[in-house]
């Protein structure tokens, strides 16, 4: 291949190699063709043999330092600040220029030869390939060519081998243990050539260069750094302030340009390396003219530059991670066993680690993964891309905002928190598929989500104490740039890599010269909602058996992942009770509200969610039991209260006959006149306790009938309970059945006079206290007219009836003649002993003397020189007035009403059935307390 056609590549091509600190220098002069030297390097067979030999030996013996790739001391980083490869800027130019930089045609043939594919170890191609999932999937949609037509062959070779070829071609032994490995992974956007216009079928695309003026400036800086490398050869490199200043100056000059190229991004990477940022992931947006018009979101791609001085002289790879061969298992050294145990734990505790804890973890875990590539099992590789790409995307989102000065696409640098979370959670299903590929069991995929959530919730206390203990060691070692979320996600991914490498010990590593990297056809998937609490997926919230297993996980937080997976599978197989599901659903709704409330402020800690969701089923179960108990108690209490009320209403007035207490019974009330009277019934059954006075109409009952009814009531005994409750239907005590709490009644025999007896509650309202049976209800009629007329009519009618009945009975029983009550009676005079006629009988409603004064009425039925009897009627709230009896003696009987009687100076409240008398020479006064008439019978003894 003629080198004259590639003269414009000589400067930029040499800068594509990241030369290590101990690499031999190439003293080039102006006009000297560097491609000739590179061509000789690629054609040297002995060097290729050594290259393959050292690569095979170095893999199993190399100690992988996982965390050293993330955290290096500033001194180590400054030591390697000079021998950086000068960045390559890609630009769309001619289609005839090949994208793969080839020193010679022999190199091109060696790239495609399968034999050489198996002799060079491409350890960092597949695992470090970090394409953006969204960008690659959308780029596959908008691309116009097939997958086979757009393969990118990027076989750069080891720059140290190429550089050493000039000084000593025959040297075969290259030290592999004296150098340290440091990986720089950064994400860049390759300006894709529009395949629809400028790429022919099955073409190899080329790296083109623009901004030659900037590259010349960089070349001058590089030559100065080469001269410094000569002076410091054989010694350990130290930080060079002048080199750093030159790199910063060159970076700032490039950033003044309107658009950023790959070289600009690489200089930023060099600068950040000297500022103790060991892994730099940068997102560079390509110029708009270098991409198809439809690929507005498909611009970004990722480059991984891996400097490794561990196995042989520095191997530097610039890879374009597209769809490539599958990822095989990574090897691990036996010295990692203690670190791997902590690595397993760190994947569950990633959600609540502080940034300083992350820095401590990066220093404490030091195995370095050696990732190999194998052209089989493409599905696992795609998932590994998602795994690594998710880490790079998280870190890039913060680095882009801090360092990227490109303003062409500001919308990408201002993503919302919700979009970042979606990108973060995108790789979670892919991580589970990695575990499926390693164990060859597809069923484990469903259990990983369960296992992650379960073990995070169960081990959080123990792990938080351990992490806080480690925080004291590394308080000052914090990531320089990046938010808490991106650092947390990065720590999670690195712990995933450790766990993945522990499962793949003692695996053979194939050798390849180049890696055929094609476009990835991964489908963009929605982020996994692991943070959403689901009752059916997370057994911690819904399965009652998990509560029994939680102490086991708290006590055995260092168990292996397999045991946890098995336990999670067993938990998933168990059935969930229906009541627990309902309870868990209620708890999950609370947790979801809690998450929504906290969503604007950031990510909610999983320990809070787990505490809420774990305690809520227990609390809800206890609440259900307590609620049922309270319900049962309330029902029983209510029924017992009803019974007590009924018994109180029944038992309080029901006193023995000897006690003399009386209870009130309802009598007939006059709605028109509002006049009332009472009747005396002792031990007459349940009655209203709060109702002292029962309304009644004007008295239409004569004295004899009232006394007769009272006598009948005295003869009746206490009404049994079944007489009171035979109509009541109390609430049933059914724990699991929803029944009414009302006190129901069977149909009442209203035609017999059955009525409901209501009792007033202290809080207001009424409560059914029982049913008034016909035995307790008075059958007295209500008076509708004047008391005189009513009494006359009713009494006359009753007298006639009674007389007829008497006559009938007497005629049947006795055969004697009867006297006329209206006629005087023949009696013997005591003094003269002669027979005289006297009025001894006074029929009803007949009187000898009548006095009316307002509402006060006095009827004298019998009046003799020695005594007189009669009836005193007081109107509603009427007072008789204070009166002196003189020499007479007055005897009173309260026929109906409630009275305030004052005997000389002592007041008394007397009611129906009471009697009192006033001795001679004293005063008395009577006042009606009711709103109806009160009736008293009196007897005056004359002296």
Swiss-Prot record:
Biological processes annotated in GO: attachment of mitotic spindle microtubules to kinetochore; cell division; chromosome segregation; kinetochore assembly; mitotic cell cycle; spindle attachment to meiosis I kinetochore
Keyword Repeat on entry: no
Phosphoserine carried by residues: 73, 96, 146, 189, 225, 261, 316, 333, 376, 397, 439, 528, 538, 684, 709-710, 763, 773
Short motif Nuclear localization signal, span: 259-273, 484-499, 558-574, 780-798
Biased composition (Basic residues): 412-426, 570-583
PANTHER family the record matches: CENTROMERE PROTEIN C
Subunit structure, as described in the record: Oligomer. Component of the CENPA-NAC complex, at least composed of CENPA, CENPC, CENPH, CENPM, CENPN, CENPT and CENPU. The CENPA-NAC complex interacts with the CENPA-CAD complex, composed of CENPI, CENPK, CENPL, CENPO, CENPP, CENPQ, CENPR and CENPS. Binds to DAXX. Interacts with DNMT3B. Interacts directly with CENPA. Identified in a centromere complex containing histones H2A, H2B and H4, and at least CENPA, CENPB, CENPC, CENPT, CENPN, HJURP, SUPT16H, SSRP1 and RSF1. Interacts with MEIKIN.
Protein name: Centromere protein C
Lineage of the organism: Eukaryota, Metazoa, Chordata, Craniata, Vertebrata
């Amino acid at each position: 291949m003629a080198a004259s056609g590639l003269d414009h590549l000589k400067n930029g091509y040499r800068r594509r190699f990241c030369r290590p600190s101990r690499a031999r220098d190439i003293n080039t002069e102006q006009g000297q063709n560097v491609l000739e030297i590179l061509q000789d390097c690629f054609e040297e067979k002995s060097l290729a043999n050594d290259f393959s030999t050292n690569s095979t030996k170095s893999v199993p013996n190399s100690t992988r330092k996982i965390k050293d790739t993330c955290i290096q001391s500033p001194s180590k980083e400054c030591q390697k600040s000079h021998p950086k490869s000068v960045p390559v800027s890609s630009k769309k130019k001619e289609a005839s220029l090949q994208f793969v930089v080839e020193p010679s045609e022999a190199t091109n043939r060696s790239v495609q030869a399968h034999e050489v594919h198996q002799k060079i170890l491409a350890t960092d191609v597949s695992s470090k390939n970090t394409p953006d999932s969204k960008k690659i999937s959308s780029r596959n949609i908008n691309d116009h060519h097939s997958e086979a037509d757009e393969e990118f062959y990027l076989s750069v070779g080891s720059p140290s081998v190429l550089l050493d070829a000039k000084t000593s071609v025959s040297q075969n032994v290259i030290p592999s243990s004296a150098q340290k490995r440091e990986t720089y992974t950064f994400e860049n956007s390759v300006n894709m050539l529009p395949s629809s216009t400028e790429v022919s079928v099955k073409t190899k695309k080329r790296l083109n260069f623009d901004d030659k003026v900037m590259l010349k400036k960089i070349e001058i800086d590089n030559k100065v750094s080469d001269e410094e490398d000569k002076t410091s050869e054989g010694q350990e490199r130290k930080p060079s302030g002048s080199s750093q200043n030159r790199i910063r100056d060159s970076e700032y000059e490039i950033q003044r340009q309107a658009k950023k190229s790959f070289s600009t991004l690489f200089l930023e990477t060099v600068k950040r390396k000297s500022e103790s940022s060991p892994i730099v992931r940068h997102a560079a947006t390509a110029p708009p003219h270098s991409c198809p018009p439809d690929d507005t979101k498909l611009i970004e791609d990722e480059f991984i530059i891996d400097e490794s001085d561990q196995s042989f002289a520095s191997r530097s790879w610039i890879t374009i991670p597209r769809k490539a061969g599958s990822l095989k298992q990574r090897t691990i050294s036996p010295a990692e066993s203690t670190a791997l145990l902590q690595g397993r734990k760190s994947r569950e505790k990633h959600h609540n680690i502080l940034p300083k804890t992350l820095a401590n973890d990066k220093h404490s875990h030091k195995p370095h993964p050696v990732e190999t590539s194998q052209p089989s099992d493409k599905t696992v590789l795609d998932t590994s891309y998602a795994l690594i790409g998710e880490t790079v995307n998280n870190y890039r989102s913060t680095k882009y905002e801090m360092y990227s000065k490109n303003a062409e696409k500001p919308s990408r640098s201002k993503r919302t928190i919700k979009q970042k979370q979606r990108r973060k959670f995108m790789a979670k299903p892919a991580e589970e598929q990695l575990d499926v590929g390693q164990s060859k069991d597809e069923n484990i995929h469903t259990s990983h989500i369960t296992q992650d959530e379960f073990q995070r919730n169960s081990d959080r206390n123990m792990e938080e104490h351990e992490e806080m203990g480690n925080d004291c060691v590394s308080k000052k070692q914090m990531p320089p740039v990046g938010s808490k979320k991106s650092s947390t996600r990065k720590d999670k991914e690195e712990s995933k890599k450790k766990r993945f490498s522990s499962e793949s010990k003692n695996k053979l590593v194939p050798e390849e010269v180049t890696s055929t990297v094609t476009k990835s056809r991964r489908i963009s998937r929605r982020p996994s909602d692991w943070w959403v609490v689901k009752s059916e997926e997370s057994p911690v919230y819904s399965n009652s058996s998990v509560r029994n297993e939680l102490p086991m996980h708290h006590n055995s937080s260092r168990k292996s992942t397999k045991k946890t997976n098995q336990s999670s599978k067993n938990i998933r197989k168990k059935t969930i009770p229906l009541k627990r599901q309902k309870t868990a659903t209620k708890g999950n709704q609370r947790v979801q509200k809690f998450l929504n409330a906290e969503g604007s402020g950031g990510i909610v800690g999983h320990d809070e969610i787990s505490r809420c969701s774990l305690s809520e089923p227990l609390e809800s179960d206890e609440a259900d039991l307590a609620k049922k108990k309270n319900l049962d108690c309330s029902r029983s209490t209510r029924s017992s209260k009803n019974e007590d009320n009924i018994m109180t209403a029944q038992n309080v007035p029901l006193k023995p006959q000897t006690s003399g207490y009386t209870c009130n019974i309802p009598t007939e009330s006059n709605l028109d006149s509002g006049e009332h009277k009472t009747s005396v019934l002792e031990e007459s059954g349940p009655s209203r306790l709060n109702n002292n006075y029962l309304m009644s109409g004007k008295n239409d009952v004569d004295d004899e009938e009232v006394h007769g009814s009272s006598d009948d009531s005295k003869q009746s005994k206490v009404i049994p309970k079944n007489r009171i409750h035979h109509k009541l239907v109390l609430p049933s005590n059914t724990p699991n059945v929803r029944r009414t709490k009302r006190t129901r009644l069977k149909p009442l025999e209203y035609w017999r006079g059955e009525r409901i007896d209501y009792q007033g509650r202290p809080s207001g309202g009424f409560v059914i206290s029982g049913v008034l049976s016909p035995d307790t209800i008075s059958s007295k009629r209500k008076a509708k007219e004047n008391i005189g007329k009513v009494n006359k009519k009713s009494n006359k009618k009753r007298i006639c009836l009674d007389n007829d009945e008497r006559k009938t009975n007497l005629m049947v029983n006795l055969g004697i003649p009867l006297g006329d009550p209206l006629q005087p009676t023949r009696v013997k005079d005591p003094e003269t002993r002669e027979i005289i006629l006297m009025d001894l009988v006074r029929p009803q409603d007949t009187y000898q003397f009548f006095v009316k004064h307002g509402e006060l009425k006095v009827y004298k039925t019998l009046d003799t020189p020695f005594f007189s009897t009669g009836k005193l009627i007081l109107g509603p709230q009427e007072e008789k007035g204070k009166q002196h009896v003189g020499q007479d003696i007055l005897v009173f009987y309260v026929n109906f009403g409630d009275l305030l009687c004052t005997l000389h100076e002592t007041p008394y409240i007397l009611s129906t059935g009471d009697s009192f008398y006033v001795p001679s020479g004293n005063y008395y006064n009577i006042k009606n307390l009711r709103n109806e008439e009160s009736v008293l019978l009196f007897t005056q003894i004359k002296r």
